[in-house]
Amino acid sequence: RHTLDELTDHVHTLLWQWYADAQAERIGRTAQRAMLYELAATPKPGLVDRRNNGAHTDMDFYTFIDSVCITAPYFAQCAREGLCGPADGAALFARLKMHGLKAEGDMLGATGGVNTHKGEIFSLGLISAAWARLTRYGAPVSAGSICKTAADIFSSAVPDAHGLSGARLSAHGGFALALNPALPILRREAQNGMDTA
């Protein structure tokens, strides 16, 4: 026989697991949708879009779709880590890195060795975990709070930005250029009826 407290604890555990799985899947689907929207954005001079391969001879629209499909489960994994993983930022980042390296390998396998999304795997994985971490602690979720939390997680593992570039430098700085000017411009154009895809 079990006590009422034991049964209550067990029910709370089951409910939390259900909630965490549902939230992780939702965040993962949102990350996948973001990748597809970014791919569909046309024109993107020099980059792969719906109309052409830009400056690339080793990849096309369908190479990117293959990459998005194979890496999609990774973002839900990152969100699960944010919801249920280590509270310590450096330990959390170590787990994200492990998942990220596997996702990179999956991407390279699906694309015949072509790097279509290495930076996006890093950035959206970190953002997925940050969004989930805010949800875990009942904190307000916004683009700004997600980016700040992502920067906090990454900075706890890599405190010095010296020598960083690309996606890692952007993460260390809280994705500042994405927040301003990019996000306000995107929102304004969407309100004005522009096709933002």
What kind of feature is each model-predicted range?
Residues 76-132:
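Long, hydrophobic/aromatic-enriched structural stretches that serve as scaffold segments
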Residues 2-89, 93, 131-197:
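Phosphate-rich cofactor/ligand-interacting catalytic cores and adjacent structured alpha/beta frameworks
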